[in-house]
Structure formats: C-alpha cells, structure tokens
Amino acid sequence: MKSLLALVAGNLVTAVSGHGYLTVPASRTRLGFEAGIDTCPECSILEPVSAWPDLTAAQVGRSGPCGYNARVSVDYNQPGDYWGNEPVVSYTAGDVVEVQWCVDHNGDHGGMFTYGICQNQTLVDLFLTPGYLPTNEEKQAAEDCFLEGELSCLHVPGQTCNYNPDCSAGEPCYQNDWFTCNAFQADNNRACQGVDGAALNSCMTTIAGGYTVTKKIKIPDYSSSHTLLRFRWNSFQTAQVYLHCADIAIVGGSGSSPSPTSTTSTATSTTTPSSTSCASAISIPVTFNALVTTTYGENVYLAGSISQLGSWSTSSAVALSASKYSSSSPLWTVTVDLPVGATFEYKYIKKESDGSIVWESGPNRSYTVPTGCSGTTATESGAWR
C-alpha cells in the first residue's frame, strides 16, 4: 500500500504546494506571517528526508526545531523583531491545554505529529538569544531534547490516542504516544483535516485555505520564565517534516530553571512567581499588540465575542493606544483584564475620522486566556490583515 501511495505522491508532488504550521499557541511562524514577513507560513519544510515509517530518523539540519522557510529566507531558530523575545502565553505545570495547527487544503499529507518541551534551559537559551543563530549541531541537540520531552497523547486522561491507519504493526510508526491523522485515502474526514472535521478556511493559509487540527497536551512538572513548545509533523505521503515552535512560560512546577541572562528584550515580559505554590488568578492582563499602519484621524479598536471586548459591538470595542507608534513599527497596543480559561474570537477594526468602520479581512482570530498564578500576564501579537 505504501509503495503504491508513494508512486501516486511522486506523480503529484509538483502540484502539492501547501502544508501546515502551529497556530495555538502562536508560533514564531504565525507571528512572522501576521507581521507580513512570512508570505507562506505553511511552507517551512524540512525536505527531502526520511519521514516515514521511522518518525525520528531525520536530522533537522538547518530547519532546527523552530523551522526555516526557504521561500522567504527566514530562520525561526533565532529571535526576530516580532517573535522570540518574550513568551506569547504562560501555562501552569500540570494543566491540560488545547493546542492547534493549521493544515493547507492542497498539502494535507497525512501522517503523525507530536509536541515537546525541552527541559535543558541551557540548550533552549541558544534559541532565545537575539542576534545568535544556533549551529546545525545545536539545532539537532535541541530537537533530540524536545523528542525526549515529548508531550504524549497518552498523558491526557480520556483523550483518544489511536494508531495511524497507514502504519502497520511492527513498523516504527506503530505507536500511539504521538498524535495521528486519519487514513490518507479515507473517503470521509481524510488525513489531518479529518481530525477536527472543521470547515475549509477555519484557519489561515496562503495557498488553498486551511483546516484546524486540534489536540490537548499536559504541561510537564517544570518551571521556566521563557522556554519553547515544539511542534513536529511527519508526513506520510511525502518525504517531508514540518517543525515550528512557540515561546511560552511555565509556572508552578517543582523543577525550575533560571531566567535567561543573555536576552536583552525591553518588551514587557510575562511575570512568573518564584514560589512553586501560588494563588490562582481569576483574571489576567492580556496585552494585544497589533501592527496597523494608519493615517491621521484613524484609530484602531479591538472587537470580540466576549463582553470585555464589546460582544462584537463596534461602539463598545476597546480602543488601542498609538503611544508606541512609529513609521518603522506601526504598533497599536492595549491591555485588557480577561477571565482565565476564556476562549473567544476577535478582530481589529479601524474607525475613520468620519465615523465609518473598517474591519480587517480574513477569518476571525481566536484566543484562549491562559491559567496561572496571581501576577501572571500574557501577550498576543499580530498584524492587520
């Protein structure tokens, strides 16, 4: 069966141009896309490599654990202006949280995927240091650490963890600690898009529209003021692996690591209590940073599906501040106290000087407020679409 599908894949490879990337929590790739730097976030690809049936055979090379997009020559293994300088979300050790990636309609190659957290802070710090690009050897060492720190499907009580239907017993891929896509040639709910069964354009890709792929992971008993969550998808159809990472913080764990001393970001960082026990927050301040180019008289607002964001009413939308705006960095920002665990949709809008409203394009953005100790903060960054 695999040899037949490989032949079919070989005949189709020139037609397949879209793939997938981590969206929740916001990966470095997603932030690069929203900032207008990455024109094809689903196109960070490690290829050609041995991706199947041995899921860990491929060396990550230049792609590293965070991905390299050759289309735009962006290496996400080092911090940039719009990613890598601070956590995008703070989690509490032991929590079960929802994670999501986006697969393109034209590049749903089936296969299996996994998440990992490397608990070697010295290694991780190499990927948090502005101006430093880790070597290929350091990238591989980090990927090995992420594989060791796998966040297994089986760690989440009650979660269904199936074997991949395109993998036979006895093959290295016959394991259910990794998450699996559905059968590549299934008549209904095929491959990775079949995991959620979501509608086309339920998430954003630039080739043919995307489908969400949602699972749950359990945050390990570990603490770090800034670390990385790595996502890896091994394709069944093609000789490709997709790697992405998101900057996160973890509080409340028994194991801990010192804050990185090599980073020099002046952006507001997520605060984390030093105690391993803490009072849980009821709400946390979430800072929304949006890159929106405006003209004199225009103002930017945040409208969303919850009451704190006006329940989609433009007259009750939350105003952003342009106090940090410049021609080179058109930043609008606002901090809103939001209830922990709340999941909502939102969009940015412009209010013109004549009172007219302009909504940004594309599907609604989505966000889940993290849980954490009292004093925890979170940041969500994006760019006008």
UniProtKB/Swiss-Prot annotation:
A single GO cellular-component term on record: membrane
Keywords from the named record: Carbohydrate metabolism, Copper, Disulfide bond, Glycoprotein, Metal-binding, Methylation, Oxidoreductase, Polysaccharide degradation, Secreted, Signal
Name of the encoding gene: aasA
Name recorded for this polypeptide: AA13 family lytic polysaccharide monooxygenase aasA
CDD domains (UniProt xref): CBM20_glucoamylase
Enzyme class of the recorded protein, top EC level: oxidoreductase
Organism field: Emericella nidulans (strain FGSC A4 / ATCC 38163 / CBS 112.46 / NRRL 194 / M139)
Biotechnology: Starch-active PMOs provide an expanded perspective on studies of starch metabolism and may have potential in the food and starch-based biofuel industries.
Subcellular compartments: Secreted
Catalyzed reactions per annotation: starch + reduced acceptor + O2 = D-glucono-1,5-lactone-terminated malto-oligosaccharides + short-chain malto-oligosaccharides + acceptor + H2O
Domain CBM20: 278-385
Gene disruption: observed consequences: Impairs degradation of resistant potato starch, but has limited impact on less-resistant wheat starch and no impact on processed solubilized starch.
Residue positions where Methylhistidine is found in the record: 19
Residues in the signal sequence: 1-18
One Pfam family here: CBM_20
